[in-house]
């Protein structure tokens, strides 16, 4: 018999896949149970309902993503461009570990089903990125565009590249990642 953590992990994995592919409204608890290979009742041992499941999953991935992009900056004193490199590396690491999670975060970030705790976690992520861009603008390094435009350039482009990798239109290589990072930097910086 599977252990409790293994079942819960299977439920999270199945939920992430289905929510990312189908969205919240089109995903049902029986679909999640079938994909996770657990009984439908098993899900309700861990989660009150679909809303509590999606919120826990959302918070988990938002917080982990924030940790990934923050981690390189904590000790970074070599300059703004190096800080950008660490954020990019954090994005790559997170996406390699959770291929569908960024898409899930993006498509569910404005969901009416999100709790206050989920909204605050997402706001903390957005504020971290905005603060990074504001600092770059103060230093004259980052283009004078609205923060949301800068976020769209960074994450939108990155997510599109990773989607092409997932669908085998691109091969994940160090050269590709270096080129993508340099292209994103050129799009965001005044020094391109």
Swiss-Prot record:
Top-level division of the source organism's lineage: Bacteria
Annotated region of DNA binding: 28-47
Every HTH tetR-type domain range: 5-65
Pfam families membership: TetR_C_10, TetR_N
MF annotations from Gene Ontology: DNA-binding transcription factor activity; transcription cis-regulatory region binding
Keywords per UniProt: DNA-binding, Repressor, Transcription, Transcription regulation
Entry-linked InterPro entries: BscR_C, DNA-bd_HTH_TetR-type_CS, Homeodomain-like_sf, HTH-type_TetR-like_transc_reg, HTH_TetR, Tet_transcr_reg_TetR-rel_C_sf
Stated role: Negatively controls the expression of the cytochrome p450BM-3 gene at the transcriptional level.
Protein's name in the database: HTH-type transcriptional repressor Bm3R1
Protein's organism: Priestia megaterium (Bacillus megaterium)
Gene name for this UniProt entry: bm3R1
